[in-house]
Amino acid sequence: MLNRYPLWKNLMVIFIVAIGILYSLPNIYGEDPAVQISGTRGQEANTSVLGQVQDVLKTNNLPTKSIVLENGSILARFTNTDDQLLAKDKIAERLGNNYTTALNLAPATPAWLSMFGANPMKWGLDLRGGVRFLMEVDMNATLVKRQEQLQDSLRGELRKEKIQYTAIKNTEHFGTLITLANVSQRAKAERIIRQLHPTLDITEPDADSINLGLSTAALNEARDLAIEQNLTILRKRVAELGVAEAVIQRQGAERIVIELPGVQDTARAKEILGATATLEFRIVNQNVTADAISRNMLPADSEVKYDRQGHPVALFKRAVLGGEHIINSSSGLDQHSSTPQVSVTLDSEGGEIMSQTTKKYYKKPMATLYVEYKDNGKKDENGKTILEKHEEVINVATIQGRFGSNFQITGVDSIAEAHNLSTLLKSGALIAPIQIVEERTIGPSLGAQNVEQGINASLWGLVAVIAFMLFYYKMFGVIASFALVINIVLLVGLMSILPGATLSMPGIAGIVLTLGMSVDANVLIFERIKEEIRNGRSIQQAINEGYNGAFTSIFDANLTTILTAIILYAVGTGPIQGFAITLSLGVAISMFTAITGTRALVNALYGGKQLKKLLI
C-alpha cells in the first residue's frame, strides 16, 4: 500500500528521536561554578580533607549547592563565581601544596540523566570564556641540542673504532666538522658514520676533514618529533591544572594552540604551560683545578657552570640523564635539615642508568643542573623572540651509595619553587623550549553575551522559517516545522555525545545554516508533490512520487555540502573546524528529518486514506 511505513521503520524513527531528546536534555540544566580538590604526590582526598574543606567554607560563610567526595577528589559547587573564587583561595591556603585546588565548571545534570552517560555539549572559548595561548616552539634550541648529542656520540664512536681526530666543532646550519689526525682513516670514518647515522649528509671540504649536515628529511623529522612530544607534555600539564575540555593542537609547522575554556586563574596556567625548566644530572670533573678554570684551560669533554652564589663548577658535558627519564616527582621538606627538597622517581631505563653511574662514581660528586629558557627581550630577523638558555648548579652532592629509580634533590630556594619544579618534572620536560607569542582572554560576561546573541540568532531564524512554512504550505508546513525542531534536538544531542565536538560561535552559524538547508529539502519535496497533483495524479501517488522524485536532488545537494565541510575541517583550524563539524552533522541529520522523519508523519496522517484535497 502506498505511503505506509512498516512497523520497524516507524519504531526506528521513534527510537532515534527519543535518544536525541534524552541526550540533548542535559543542556537545559547548564553548569555550576565549582572548585575541585585533588591530591598530589599520589595522594587522594579523603573524609579528613573533606572535613577541612567544609570547615573552611563554614568559617568564611561560603554557601555551597553541594560538596561531594568521589574517586579520591572533592567537588564543591557554588551558586556564583564570586563565592567560587574566594573559596578556591581559602581552600588552597588551608590545604597547602599537598593538594591541587582548581577552578572548574561542573555540569548540573540530574542523576537520572547521568545514569545514561548524558552530559551537556562542550562549549568553546568564545561561548564559555577562558584563555587561549598561541605558543611557538624554538626549533633552534632543539637542533642545537641534537647537534650536541650527535657530537658526543661521534666522539665515542670514533674512539671505539680507533679513529683519531684533532677536533669536532660546530658549523653553520647545525652542521658538524670533524678534523682527522690521519687522512688515511677518512674512508673508514665515513663508512662508520654512514652506518650509524644514515640521515646525515656527508661532504669533504678538505682532505683531512668531514663535514656533516642534517638532511631536509632529518630536519623535518626533528621538527615533527619536537612538536608531537611537546603536545604530549602540554596535555599532561593541562591535566595538572585540572582543566576539562581543553583544546591542544598543532598549528602550522612550529606552533601550538591551547584553549582552556572556563579557566579564570590565567596567571597560574601561563606559569605552568610556558615554563621550560628541567634538570640534568652531571658528574663533577675533579681533575679541573680552580687555576685551569680561571684560565679557561678545560678538557674538551668538560665545561664550567655556576651555582647560585656565582662559584664555578667544572662538569662533564655529557649528562648522566635528563628530565625525559623522570616519571614522577613530589616536593616536601628534608627530614633532617627541614629544607625544601624534590623527590624524584625515574623510569626503568633511567633507574638502570643511575644505578650504574652511582656504582661507577662512588664517593665522587654529582651535580644537579637546573636548565631554563628565558626571553632576553631581543628578536631575530624574522621578528621571533630569542630565548636565552640559563643554567645553574643547584646542588652538588657526593655519591654515598648505589641508588636507582628513587632519590631526593636539595638546593632549591623555597617550598613554592620545589612545588613548581616538582609539577614540571612530573608532567615532563619539554623537548624543545616554547614561548607564548599570543595570549587572548575572553571573560565569562563576553562569553555569556556571545551565547545570548547566538541563541537569539537561532531562534529568530527558526521563527522566520516556521512562519514562512506555515503560511505557504499549510498543514505540510506544520509537519516541516515539527521536523525542523526535531532536527535541532537531534543535532544538540549528537554534539553532546560525540567526544571532541565543541560548540562555538561559528558552530552556531553552522546550525542556523542547517535550518535553512533542512527546510530547502522539504520545499523540494512539497513542490514536487504539488507538481504531481497538477499533472493529474491521485493524492497518494503524488505524495509517493514527491518523496521518491525529490530524493536524488536532495541527496546530491547535501552530499556536495558535506564534502565541502570535510575539506573545511581538513584544511581549517579552530573556529573553521567547529563550523565544519556542525554543518556536516546538521546536513546529515536534516536528510533524516526532512526525508524519513516528515515521510513518517505524512504517512501517519494521510497514508491509506481516500483524500480529495491536500492542504499544501
From Swiss-Prot:
Q: Does the keyword Ligase apply?
A: no
UniProt main location, coarse: membrane
This protein's name:
Protein translocase subunit SecD
Q: How does it assemble?
A: Forms a complex with SecF. Part of the essential Sec protein translocation apparatus which comprises SecA, SecYEG and auxiliary proteins SecDF-YajC and YidC.
List, alphabetically, the InterPro entries matched.
Acrflvin-R, SecD, SecD-TM, SecD/SecF_arch_bac, SecD/SecF_CS, SecD_1st, SecD_SecF_C, SecD_SecF_C_bact
**Topologically, how does it sit relative to the membrane?**
Multi-pass membrane protein
Q: What does this protein do?
A: Part of the Sec protein translocase complex. Interacts with the SecYEG preprotein conducting channel. SecDF uses the proton motive force (PMF) to complete protein translocation after the ATP-dependent function of SecA.
GO MF entries: protein-transporting ATPase activity
Q: Which organism is it from?
A: Haemophilus influenzae (strain ATCC 51907 / DSM 11121 / KW20 / Rd)
Membrane spanning residue stretches: 11-31, 453-473, 475-495, 497-517, 547-569, 585-605
Q: Name one GO cellular component term.
A: plasma membrane
Reading the lineage from the top rank, the first entry is Bacteria
What Pfam families does this protein's entry cite?
A: Sec_GG, SecD-TM1, SecD_1st, SecD_SecF_C, SecDF_P1_head
Q: Does the keyword Transmembrane helix apply?
A: yes
